[in-house]
Amino acid sequence: MADQRKAALDNALRKIEKNFGKGSIMRMGDAADTKIATISSGSLAIDEALGVGGYPRGRIIEMYGPESSGKTTVALHAVAEVQRRGGTAAYIDAENALDPQYATALGVQINDLLLSQPDTGEQGLEIADALIASGAVDIVVVDSVAALVPRAEIEGEMGDTHVGLQARLMSQALRKLSGEINKTKTIAIFINQIREKVGVMFGNPETTPGGRALKFYSTIRMEIRRGEQLKNGTDVIGNRAKIKVVKNKVAPPFRKAEVDIMYGEGISKTGELLDMAVEKDLVNKSGAWYSYGNERIGQGRENAKQWFADHEDAMNELMNKVRVAYGMEPDEAPATKEGEPQQETIEEASSDK
C-alpha cells in the first residue's frame, strides 16, 4: 500500500513538472539554502528587533505611524544600506515630499537612486511592478500608501464619494506584486499613515488606509511612534523613536527597539551602539562614566557617543562585537565614505534572481 502511494505521488510530481516546468514543485528541504537572506536596516537596534538581522529579501514590509514619527527616516536608512552594499534602490514618492539634502545626510547616493513621483496610484504601482519584475532592483520604497490616489478620484470632483476605491486598488496590486517580489528577491517597503475610525467606543480606534490587503501580504509590520525630545541644553536636537514589530512571519513578533533620530542626521548609530553595548557589558557604565576596554571614554551619554564618533575603528570593532552578542552575523560590507566608490557585496545574497 505504501509503495502504491509513493508511486502515485511520484507520478503526480512528474505530471506537474511536465505541465508547469521544472521547479514548479519541490520538497522544501531540496532548496539550496533554506536560510532567509536579509539586508541590514542600517540600524543595529532595528536589526535585533526584526529577529533575523535585517529585512528579509523577497518580502513585503509595512511601516506605519503618526506624522513626523520617523517612518521615512527608517526607510531611507534601508535604502542607504542597500546602496552601501552595491545594490540598486528605487523610491516611489507619492507624497512628493522627499528631501534630497536630508536623504544625502542619511547616506543615500541620490545620483544613483531611482525616483518616481507618480500622478496617480495606478501609475505608482505600475512603476513599482515594472521595477520589481526587472529583477535588477534590490529595494523599492512606496511613500506612502495613503497618497496613492486612484485615477477616478483624481479626475473626479472634490465632493464625489469613491467608496473602497483605494482598498480595491491595493488588493489588486498586491495580488500581482507578491509573487514577483518573492521571485526576484526584492524588498518592498510600504510606508503608511494612521487614520481613526469614527464612533469606536472600545478598543483601538486607529487604522491604516488602503484596506486589509497590505496587512495580510506583509511579512513584517512595524509601528513607529515618536518618543521624548533629545536636548542639548535648551536646544532640541532630535527625538527618540519607538519601534514595535507588530507582525513578523520570519521571527517572533512584538519585539521593540528605541533609536535616537537626530535632526538633519537621521538615526544615531553611536547612540544605539552604546545602549546595546552597555546592555551586554561590552561597555562598562559606572555612574555617569562610560569605559571601553581599559579606557574611560566619556562622562555622560552624549560624550561617550561623541568618543565613538571620533574613533571609527573602535566603533566598527564594537559594532561587530554587539552583532555577535545579539546573535547576528558580523557586518562584512565595507564602510564607504561620501564620494568613495561602492563595492559590489550584495550580489551573493541576490544570486537567486
Swiss-Prot record:
Keywords: ATP-binding, Cytoplasm, DNA damage, DNA recombination, DNA repair, DNA-binding, Nucleotide-binding, SOS response. ATP binds at residues 65-72. NCBIfam families: tigrfam_recA. This is Protein RecA. Belongs to the RecA family. One of its GO terms (molecular function) is single-stranded DNA binding. Its main location: cytoplasm. Pfam families: RecA (PF00154), RecA_C (PF21096). GO terms for cellular component: cytosol. The keyword Nucleotide-binding applies. The keyword Isomerase does not apply.
